Each structure stands twice: as C-alpha cells, then as structure tokens.
Amino acid sequence: NAGVSIATLDDAKKLYSGFDLCHAATSVSMTINGPAPMMLGFFMNVAIDQQCEKYIKANGLEKEVEQKIEAIYKQKGLKRPSYSGKLPEGNNGLGLMLLGVSGDEVLPKAVYEKIKAEAIATVRGTVQADILKEDQAQNTCIFSTEFALRMMGDIQQYFIHNQIQNFYSVSISGYH
C-alpha cells in the first residue's frame, strides 16, 4: 500500500505544482493501469491549466482572474480550495492559481482552446495503461477488460485527432 492518493483534479494540481509539465525537459511516466484513463485526464488538464496560469501571469490578468474565481465560489456558497502548508523548497507554485476551477472558466474560449492545443501537443510522457497485464498477470481489474480496452482505444483516437505525438498512451508491460 504505497503511492499518492489522487482523487480529484485539484489533488493532481497539487502533486504536479512547481513542475512545468510542458517544459521541453519534462517527461512524466505513470506506471498505472486500471485507473490510467482518469489519471491521464487529470494529467492533461493540469498541464493545460498550468499553461493557462502562465498566460494569465504573462498578460497581467491575475487580479481579473482572481475576481472571477472568487465570484464562482461566492455564487456556489463554498470556500475556495487552497494549498495548505508550505510549498517545498524550489517549488514556485505553478499550477496552484486555478485550484477549484479550470482555465476554460476564466479565460475567453478562443484563448483557452489555443493554450489547450499547444499544451497537449507539447506535453511529454508515458502512461502504462496495460489492461491486459492487469487482467492476465495480476487479476486486479477495476473495469471489465472489454470496457478498459474500449477506453484505451478512445484515448488513442483522441491522441490521433488532437495530434498528441509526444505522449505515449500505452506501454505494454512484458515482465509480468
């Protein structure tokens, strides 16, 4: 029983905070199988929101965006999520500005779509997502094999459609 509990997008934003997921020197490898589609979705959304945050800061939009986020949470009658504790040494907090919201909620649609397209085309890494290993070698499936294979296919189709060429959506584990 080891690892990091990632139950929400905000958990993933906190985990990856301070690491620019779209930097040319960054490549993330996730050795995860059953929940791979959800973790991959979290990862891609974190990468996009980090780039939205960089855009917001580069264009001096911090105050405007903060007001939008506050209004969203005031309307919901909820407390805005925040990072608790001290940031680790060397962590610049990248990725924490948009806790509780996504870039598409605070930026114009055209701006967000451009940032999204650039982010998913730039991000680098691999997710294991080897459902056959889960089924045949470990018997630890959380989804039926048929459904898991369909999700793998859907992810690959999304990668092709969106020209995601620097991220591998499956890595077959040959050692189990």
Positions of the model-derived regions?
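Catalytic alpha/beta active-site cores
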Residues: 1-176
